[in-house]
């Protein structure tokens, strides 16, 4: 039996607020082996992230991976860590603050806008409880993954609904499934690339790199591959690129199984062997810069390309706090909030309800 968390006493006349919870993957608390061990244990224990027999995976994870990878991963994080902390957390916090300010200007009612992480801090559980304490009775969940995948957006929804099981008074919940072809998102991606090219010139080839997933997930019905392809195509069309000027590929392969291809590392190596003069890489699936962009692409990818004989290598930063991206998030949120009562009407209705309840003998 699920043990439900304590709830405050119900108060007649209380006015519920609307909350928006923006959720990203997560990050370790520090670039240390100890912090990485805790992070990787939680991350690699997610059944949607690693689809493997649980009993066998437990031995592999605890007997091998957690004794080897934390120290190696810590060294990678050390290379990208900032004075403010993890880039992913820093950018996600900034995005949240900017979106909150934008919505405050646009909306008739005050919104509570927070962010959480699937893995690490701040946790989904912590933020949902915090929003309930703040009086949110309607919460929109916005995964910061434009392309749906069971291992990303699916994990977000698992995390949210597992916490709802612990609540007696469950808030109204809406979720955003994906926005891989949202016009505002595509426009922000394209303008972000144009901004970079205006300062640094254009490449011979643009690599559009997405995080990979095992190929079997496509065969089992996951739409991720198709949504990545559509995002990449729409971005290339917005930039008016000929087919031979760009390549869509997938990075971050883990383990020995076949993943979605072509693999970014192999494409970079081949372009290097061809003595390509300049390659730029953009990662549309990562809306905030993180380990996979700043270390895997900007550092490792550059080394692969140049050591194979390539010329210039440029990594185009993620959307991060780009104004058009903040505007796009705001529009996506407003679209999904359609129909929820504004605060002024809620206050009027709540006051009438309170008076009726008191007349019937309610204490509060």
Swiss-Prot record:
Q: Where is the signal peptide?
A: none
Query: Where does this chain mainly localize?
Result: cytoplasm
**Which parts of the sequence bind Fe cation?**
211, 292
State the source organism's domain of life.
Answer: Bacteria
Subcellular localization is given as:
Cytoplasm
Q: What InterPro entries does the record tag this protein with?
A: Ferrochelatase, Ferrochelatase_AS, Ferrochelatase_C, Ferrochelatase_N
Q: Look up the record and name the pathway of this protein.
A: Porphyrin-containing compound metabolism; protoheme biosynthesis; protoheme from protoporphyrin-IX: step 1/1
GO BP term, example: heme biosynthetic process
SUPFAM superfamilies noted in UniProt: Chelatase (SSF53800)
Establish whether keyword Zinc-finger is in the entry: no
Q: Which UniProt keywords apply?
A: Cytoplasm, Heme biosynthesis, Iron, Lyase, Metal-binding, Porphyrin biosynthesis
Q: Does the keyword Cytoplasm apply?
A: yes
Under Enzyme Commission nomenclature, its number is 4.98.1.1
Q: Which CDD domains match?
A: Ferrochelatase_C, Ferrochelatase_N
- Listed GO MF terms: ferrochelatase activity; metal ion binding
Q: Would you name any one GO CC term?
A: cytoplasm
Q: Which reaction does it catalyse?
A: heme b + 2 H(+) = protoporphyrin IX + Fe(2+)
Record's function text: Catalyzes the ferrous insertion into protoporphyrin IX.
Q: Which family is this protein grouped under?
A: Belongs to the ferrochelatase family.
Spell out the NCBIfam families in the cross-references: hemH
Q: Which PANTHER family match?
A: FERROCHELATASE, FERROCHELATASE, MITOCHONDRIAL
User: What's the protein name?
Assistant: Ferrochelatase
What species does this protein belong to? Nitrosomonas europaea (strain ATCC 19718 / CIP 103999 / KCTC 2705 / NBRC 14298)
Q: Which gene encodes it?
A: hemH
């Amino acid at each position: 039996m699920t043990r439900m968390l304590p709830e405050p006493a119900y108060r007649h006349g209380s006015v519920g607020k609307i909350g928006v919870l923006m959720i990203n993957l997560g990050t370790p608390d520090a670039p240390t082996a100890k912090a990485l061990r805790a992070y990787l244990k939680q991350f690699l224990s997610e059944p949607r992230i690693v689809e493997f027999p649980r009993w066998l995976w437990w031995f592999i994870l605890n007997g091998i991976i957690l004794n080897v990878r934390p120290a190696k991963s810590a060294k990678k994080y050390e290379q990208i860590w900032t004075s403010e902390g993890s880039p992913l957390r820093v950018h996600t916090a900034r995005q949240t603050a900017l979106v909150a300010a934008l919505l405050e200007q646009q909306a008739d009612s005050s919104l509570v806008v927070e962010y959480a992480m699937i893995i690490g801090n701040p946790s989904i559980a912590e933020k949902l409880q915090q929003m309930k304490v703040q009086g949110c009775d309607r919460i929109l969940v916005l995964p910061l993954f434009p392309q749906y995948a069971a291992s990303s957006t699916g994990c977000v929804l698992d995390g949210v609904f597992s916490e709802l099981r612990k609540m007696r008074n469950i808030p109204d919940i809406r979720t955003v499934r994906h926005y891989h072809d949202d016009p505002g998102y595509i426009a922000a991606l394209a303008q972000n690339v144009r901004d970079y090219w205006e300062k640094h010139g254009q490449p011979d080839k643009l690599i559009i790199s997405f995080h990979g997933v095992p190929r079997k997930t496509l065969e089992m019905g996951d739409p991720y591959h198709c949504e990545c392809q559509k995002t990449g195509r729409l971005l290339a069309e917005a930039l008016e690129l000929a087919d031979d000027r760009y390549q869509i590929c997938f990075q971050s392969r883990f383990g020995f199984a076949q993943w979605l291809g072509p693999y970014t590392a192999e494409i970079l190596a081949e372009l290097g062997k061809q003595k390509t003069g300049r390659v730029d890489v953009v990662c549309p699936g990562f809306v905030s810069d993180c380990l996979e962009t700043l270390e895997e692409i900007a550092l490792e990818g550059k080394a692969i390309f140049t050591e194979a004989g390539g010329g210039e290598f440029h990594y185009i930063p993620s959307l991060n706090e780009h104004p058009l991206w903040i505007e796009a998030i705001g529009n996506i949120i407003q679209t999904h909030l359609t129909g929820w009562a504004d605060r002024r009407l809620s206050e009027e209705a709540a006051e009438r309800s309170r008076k009726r309840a008191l007349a019937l003998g309610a204490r509060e």
